[in-house]
Curated annotation (Swiss-Prot):
Source taxonomy: Bacteria, Pseudomonadati, Pseudomonadota, Gammaproteobacteria, Pasteurellales
Catalytic activity: [protein]-peptidylproline (omega=180) = [protein]-peptidylproline (omega=0)
Domain notes: Consists of 3 domains; the N-terminus binds the ribosome, the middle domain has PPIase activity, while the C-terminus has intrinsic chaperone activity on its own.
Protein name, UniProt field: Trigger factor
Cellular component GO terms, alphabetical: cytoplasm
Provenance organism: Mannheimia succiniciproducens (strain KCTC 0769BP / MBEL55E)
Homology family: Belongs to the FKBP-type PPIase family. Tig subfamily.
Keywords: Cell cycle, Cell division, Chaperone, Cytoplasm, Isomerase, Rotamase
Any GO molecular function: ribosome binding
Length: 431
């Protein structure tokens, strides 16, 4: 009887013996196969004597046989013992002598056995939001600002204006690297600069020259500037005011072929806001459920699964910045370790929710999700057809739907409270 030993955490070790007869037969068969195609000077193909084949190819054949026997016998055992394997095993050969049993150990990780608990202790706050006319008004203003133009003014700069400036920064009378710029365009009121910089410009007009004194934040990204007091000599070259477009037919037409009036535009905006709100609410509830699941179910995760997830995150990070696989490997694993561990935890816990509740992806919900995605495009019917003909995309949608069903299954047992909220509170929680 084979005994699988627990070494630590999710790591397991097992000793496996392969009978000498099995090894001998495998070596003999492989030598015969090699002999059929071996080319040795002085002999015809396939007619090389066995002792020469053994002398020339014996060592490499035995290594090839070993490389085949180790994983084959391990995976046979893993299947027989119903091992929930995580990652690849490592092998240590203890005996591999001719005519004797092959003895080796395999060290491997398994996925944790999960018994979900504490679902009734999970607390979820569910925002209840109604999109108001004022919310739509605000979004109309956002769209107008996105299409705004700028006009020069002789007035003093305000927090809603844009300025073009030259500046030179110094610390203790010495200029510092990165502290100088010409024709620098700065949109006021957005907090792009260090504290006090924009405030020092407010109230000044084009053509004015002046100095301001500020202090770099203690957490500033440049080490030698942290918490340092600095002086900036500033020249205001231009002050511009924002000119918002009127709600003309031309402006309205930019937002779709079916938007012809202000009412059409507002209806389209409201529909988009409802879609964005739905996604935001789903994400907020999902995050609370996942946080609760992890808090109530502390589980070990396999190092192999975390390592695999780290590589995924590394490659995604490299691609975002235009890099490749080689550059991804240079990114420190510490940057991704916590996120990778959490993703593995979430995957395992949700998989257990799905399994224990015997959930299957609801095809009607998948169809509704595709239609919702398609509604954001000018030709929704074409988008729906594209999804329906792409198996990979359809499977991705089904996986998302299945995950949502798992979240709903947890919600059904959790402590859910509703809280009246505004659109802005949900969409801009950090504001």
């Amino acid at each position: 009887m084979t005994t699988i030993e627990t070494t630590q955490g999710l790591e397991r070790r097992v000793s496996i013996t392969v009978p000498a007869e099995t090894v001998t037969t495998a070596v003999r068969d492989e030598l015969k196969r090699v002999a059929k195609n071996a080319r040795v000077d002085g002999f015809r193909k396939g007619k090389v004597p066995a002792q020469i084949i053994e002398k020339r190819f014996g060592a490499s054949v035995r290594q090839d046989v070993l490389n085949d026997l180790l994983p084959r016998h391990f995976f046979d055992l893993a299947f027989k013992e119903k091992v929930n394997l995580a990652g690849r095993p490592t092998f240590a050969v203890e005996n591999y002598e001719e005519g004797k049993d092959l003895q080796f150990t395999a060290t491997f990780e398994v996925y944790p056995e999960i018994q979900l608990q504490g679902l009734e202790n999970i607390k979820v706050e569910k925002p209840v939001v109604e999109i108001t006319d004022a919310d739509v008004d605000n979004m109309v203003e956002v769209l107008r600002k996105q299409q705004a133009t700028w006009a020069e003014t002789d007035n003093a700069a305000t927090k809603d204006d844009r300025v073009t400036i030259d500046f030179v920064g110094s610390i203790d009378g010495e200029e510092f690297q990165g502290g100088k710029a010409n024709d620098f365009v700065l949109a006021m009121g957005q907090g792009r600069m260090i504290p006090g910089f924009e405030d020092g410009i407010l109230g000044h007009k084009a053509g004015e020259q002046f100095d301001i004194e500020v202090t770099f934040p203690e957490d500033y990204h440049v080490e030698n500037l942290k918490a340092k007091p600095a002086k900036f000599a500033i020249t205001v070259k231009k002050v511009e005011v924002m000119v918002l477009p009127e709600l003309t037919a031309d402006f309205i037409a930019k937002f779709g072929p079916n938007t012809k009036t202000v009412d059409d535009l507002r209806a389209e905006i409201r529909k988009n806001m409802q879609r964005e709100l739905k996604n935001a609410l789903t994400a907020r509830v999902k995050n609370q459920v996942i946080d609760g699941l992890i808090e109530q179910n502390q589980i070990d995760v396999p190092f192999a699964a975390v390592d695999q997830e780290i590589e995924v995150l590394r490659n995604q990070a490299a691609q975002r910045f235009g890099g490749n696989g080689e550059q991804a490997a240079q990114l420190p694993r510490e940057l991704f370790e916590e996120q990778a561990k959490r993703r593995v935890q979430v995957g395992l816990l949700l998989a257990e929710v799905i399994s224990s509740n015997e959930l299957k992806a609801d095809e009607e919900k998948a169809k509704a999700m595709i239609e919702d995605i398609a509604s954001a495009y000018e030709q929704p019917a074409e988008v729906v057809e594209y999804y329906s003909k792409n198996n990979e995309l359809m499977n991705n949608i089904r996986n998302v739907v299945l995950e949502e069903q798992a979240i709903d299954a947890v919600l059904a047992k959790a402590q859910v409270t509703e809280k009246a909220s505004s659109f802005d509170e949900v969409m801009n929680p950090q504001a």
